[in-house]
UniProtKB/Swiss-Prot annotation:
Keywords: Oxidoreductase. The keyword Metal-binding does not apply. This is Ketoisovalerate oxidoreductase subunit VorA. Optimum pH is 9.7. Its EC number is 1.-.-.-. It is an enzyme of class 1 (oxidoreductase). Heterotrimer of the VorA, VorB and VorC subunits. GO terms for biological process: organic acid metabolic process; sulfur compound biosynthetic process. It comes from Methanothermobacter marburgensis (strain ATCC BAA-927 / DSM 2133 / JCM 14651 / NBRC 100331 / OCM 82 / Marburg). Pfam families: POR, TPP_enzyme_C. One of its GO terms (molecular function) is oxidoreductase activity, acting on the aldehyde or oxo group of donors, iron-sulfur protein as acceptor.
Amino acid sequence: MTKKVIRKPDSLHEVFERKGGSAPTATHYCAGCGHGILHKLIGEAIDELGIQERSVMISPVGCAVFAYYYFDCGNVQVAHGRAPAVGTGISRAEDTPVVLLYQGDGDLASIGLNETIQAANRGEKMAVFFVNNTVYGMTGGQMAPTTLIGEVTVTCPGGRDPRYAGYPLHMCELLDNLQAPVFIERVSLADPKSIRKAKRAVKRALEIQRDGKGYAFVEVLSPCPTNLRQDAEGAERFLKEEMEREFPVKNFRDRSSETEPLIRSESDFSRESLDRIFQIKEDSVPDPVDDPEFREVRVKIAGFGGQGVLSMGLTLAQAACSEGRHTSWYPAYGPEQRGGTSSCGVVISGERVGSPAVDTPDVLVAFNQPSLDEFAGDVREGGIVLYDTATADFSKKENLRAIGVPALEIAKEHGTGRAANTAMLGVMMALGITGLDEESFRDAIRFTFSGKDKIIDINLKILEAGADWARKNLEGEF
């Protein structure tokens, strides 16, 4: 003969040691709060489905932020409204997790609304339990996105007025417009009969996660007697007569029987795969070699978008890589495709680069006047400023070595005005200010434009033209 034992589910701690305090077997929730009921329903469903070891409970800011006190499974606390983002990461990073999101209306339907819609639209594998009690519970009962018309709260003492605060947000109806969700249902905790129905919805949502079928959403109409100043009878009446009238209790969809498990391809971030994707060969990018004797050089390159600022930096960084130097390339640019401000920093070092940011450059290469005006003051004392005389003018300063280079003119004379950046690279190559061999610059040009023989030839020609100009006009400069 079996004996019925009334006890907590195994997936809920018997004693809440993480909570601490003088009452380690009591929750931190107010008397009559619906969170305790829903916790038990979820715990029972986890036990019945045998998924305790696979379950990860995600609890953002709100009354249930301390859900990890109670659930004996994986637990992650997250920032306000960001549970879907973290849940997506866990769901995709692990093979078979059962991801549970436990969110309130002030969290999910307000600051987290976009996150929720996007995760639902992608059909992420997660069960979302949305607790709708019409107020911000943790912070004292302020108006929430789900507050009823005319309902009095701390922040709408005259009742919610739709002329100023809009109408209650219906999350189930909103998500039901999307194609991806597998299961959407609204339930209530108004009375024992409603709670039994809620248990079935909770279990179905977790079954879908157990089977890896996709997104499940359960909205739970829940009492908040403390903030709404209700006794047990008043809370039940409010749920049945007001909340359920505004938010009808119903199943919106259950496609679990016709949905196959969602299996995503496994990501491959191995070095071999990345090298293949970016066409990196071992002989083109050797591992850097420590050389404490090599003097670090920090270069800032700036100009308008479309002047080849970023590609010049990449080519310079490639030249350094080909010599086995530690190097970094760090871009900064505006939203414009052409004409906006663009810059990048390149660090060439004999040791590991600590930061790619070039705040105090040794060398500034400026292709326009705004770049000179903005960055010349940052160049270290004794540093070098190279600028294109076609687009900028610079008054020499005693503590800087400024060189005007007709880069645009050189490029036009030798093939194309679009390669003024390559002409400037040639000047840097001839001056030897980077500590790199000239052949490394040529190899970098070939690598940058690999597969484009005509472009390689033109750029090598302009590179040499820039270098020749420097040798003729800057002899003895360095």
